[in-house]
Amino acid sequence: MLPLASNAEENSSSEGSDVSRLTAYSDPARIWGSGVERVIEEAYRLCFHTRILGGKVMNLRMPFAQDNERNKLTGEDWGFLGGGKGNPAFLWERINQVLDSDDFRLYTETLSDGKEKVIIFDLPTQTWSVTRDLFEIARMKAGSYRGLLHRPYVLVSGRGLEETDVYNYLYCVGQAGMDCSGFVWHIQSRIAAAGGVDLGRTLARTLGAKHGEDPSWYAGTNFYNAKSSQIIPVKDEICNLRPGDILLFRAEDGRMAHSAVIQSVDFFSGIIRYLQCTDEAPLAERGVHESFIRFDPQNTAVSLSDPSLVWTQNRYRPFPGEKPSPFSDDGKRYRAYPEQGGGRVVRLRAVSQAIGKMK
């Protein structure tokens, strides 16, 4: 029996070595070093979760949590868990409960029966139904979309569950995720914490949070555009940009409608990597995802509004058949509404100070 024990010990040691190697390989510091880029990458990775669903290994991304953009026809509000401002650990706990539910199991079975069908989601009631009507299926294939903002229609093949199907369910039924500013707050909070700063406590009064309230609930995109000593305007020339800076995209009425955060600026290769949470993206990227801007390394005095820059992130309708975004890519969205000021870049003073401490 002694040789068997020895073999078991060797196997255990080998498995431990494999785990150690995988851990070292996946360490963000391997690529991003030990500075703020690594901290942002770690915070970004917290927004992904691996599950086995429908017999497949799936790397799920944190869904987008719309902020009542879809209640225009219903006149009633329904709330995403945490108002779109929850931290990843809190949200993944709820998401796992949803994915372990009997209703999601039935949803998976329905999408795996080998038959084409249309799934009809209803956001106000957090339910779904199915029709196998051939005329309805033909309408969907022909591009005749009958869905509404609060009742998305989705054509499925019946050949099994895909990651996009999981997203649809979590968005419409689970209603757990992050909105754009909630994701930015998550990143900013992690940066601040790495520098020894409690961002919520530091900005609670500025945000208008009352005692005992979660300050993150008040950190909407308009806060990042506020005239406050805690908000540092940044001239949006590439040479001025730093990891942790916040990109703001303006709406037609002059308010800021979307926010994202810069993770890295590679002045050698001419690439800006920024992170965001939105559903106006390719189906497989809806939710939290990375995006890029390409620039000429020899010309870093150029503004982000300059059309010579290449913004690689294309924008799509959240559900096939819905009205498309008026902007085909993030660059056009950033440059939009110049009469209102267009896009802009800011940084949080408390986060900037925390980054200084990290250095």
Feature-to-residue mapping (PLM):
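...with weaker cross-activation on analogous glycine-rich loops/strands in unrelated enzymes
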Residues: 197-287
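Intrinsic-disorder/low-complexity loop/linker signature
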Residues: 55, 113-116, 125-126, 229, ...
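Hydrophobic h-region of N-terminal signal peptides that target proteins for export
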Residues: 2-5
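Short regulatory "switch" loops immediately downstream of catalytic or recognition motifs
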Residues: 189-194, 264-267, 318
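N-terminal capping segments
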Residues: 16-198, 355
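Low-complexity, Gly/Ser/Thr/Pro-rich intrinsically disordered linker/tail segments
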Residues: 277-284, 288-359
